[in-house]
Regions:
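Conserved ABC ATPase signature
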Residues: 144-148, 152
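Conserved ABC ATPase "signature" region
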Residues: 123-140
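Conserved structural motif at the start of ABC-family nucleotide-binding domains
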Residues: 15, 29-32
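The feature captures the beta-strand-to-loop junction immediately N-terminal to the Walker
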Residues: 46-48
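Helix-to-loop junction immediately C-terminal to a conserved catalytic motif
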Residues: 61
Length: 263
């Protein structure tokens, strides 16, 4: 069962997922998944381990092939594009950070690869330097990326994705390895970046409270393949309790909603 988005013309920059299905062999992970991620806002995919959140992200990114359904951006079939064409539209930050022994600067410069042929242009270098500065990691430029901690590496990979200048940014648990201060700083940056640049951000998260703070919409999953999309400010105790299989209570403090789990 899936909540169907409303019919009608979609705003520019909308990532549209329709009737998506995926299976490992004979085991259907989920089917008939429908939701939208809108330009200028952040949407979170929530749920317990094993519900297919990362698999859903990989299907949208074109890494895995869905059994059925479509992924479109401004009417274009994302899954039918070449890898280079897709990289100009969608940037993906995976859950695990892996890097060769190259500088942080050169790692971020790889985000410009879809745009240059033989070598980078002055504009490519300018974008890299601006991105490093905006994320507060310009001082890391000459560091060996392979020596970074997990949290530092995630910030560098986020910088590389932003340097791609995508229309859609996919983030798989972008704050999993970050300390509290870096987590807050990164999420606020992502929200501001989405709004400023008109990018649709879709992220997998295990942090419900963080999702409630920065996201406009939530995509809720469960082990039985049930997926629904709901506005973050309209999600209910019952919906979150069903998603996580535990009693969840929503509370408000200083105009911020947060969850308490358990009876």
């Amino acid at each position: 069962m899936v909540e169907k988005p409303q019919a009608g013309a979609l705003p520019a920059g909308t990532l549209c997922v329709r009737h998506l299905a995926f299976a490992y062999g004979r085991r259907t992970l989920w089917s008939d998944v429908c939701f939208e991620a809108h330009a200028g806002s952040v949407t979170a995919i929530l749920g317990n381990n094993g519900t297919g959140k990362s698999t859903l992200m990989n299907c949208i990114a074109g890494i895995l092939k869905p059994r059925a359904g479509s992924v479109t951006l401004d009417g274009a079939d994302v899954l039918a594009l070449t890898r280079r064409e897709r990289a100009r539209l969608i940037a993906y930050v995976a859950q695990r950070f892996e890097s060769a022994s190259t500088s942080v600067y050169d790692t971020v410069l790889l985000g410009r690869l879809p745009y240059f042929a033989a070598r980078p242009s002055a504009r490519d270098y300018e974008i890299v330097e601006t991105t490093l500065r905006d994320l507060g990691i310009a001082s890391w430029a000459d560091r060996d990326a392979s020596t970074l901690s997990g949290g530092e590496g995630q910030r560098v990979m986020l910088a590389r994705a932003i340097a791609q200048q995508p229309k859609v940014l996919l983030l798989d648990e972008p704050t999993a390895s970050l300390d509290l201060g870096s987590r807050v700083e990164t999420l606020r940056y992502v929200r501001a970046y989405a709004k400023r640049c008109g990018v649709a951000v879709l992220m997998v998260s295990h942090d419900v409270n963080a999702a409630l703070e920065v996201c406009s919409h939530l995509v809720l999953t469960d082990p039985k393949g049930f997926v629904q999309s709901v506005a973050a400010d309209a999600v209910t105790d019952a919906q979150l309790s069903h998603t996580y299989g535990v009693s969840v209570r929503l509370r408000t403090l200083e105009d911020r909603r947060f969850v308490l789990a358990g009876d």
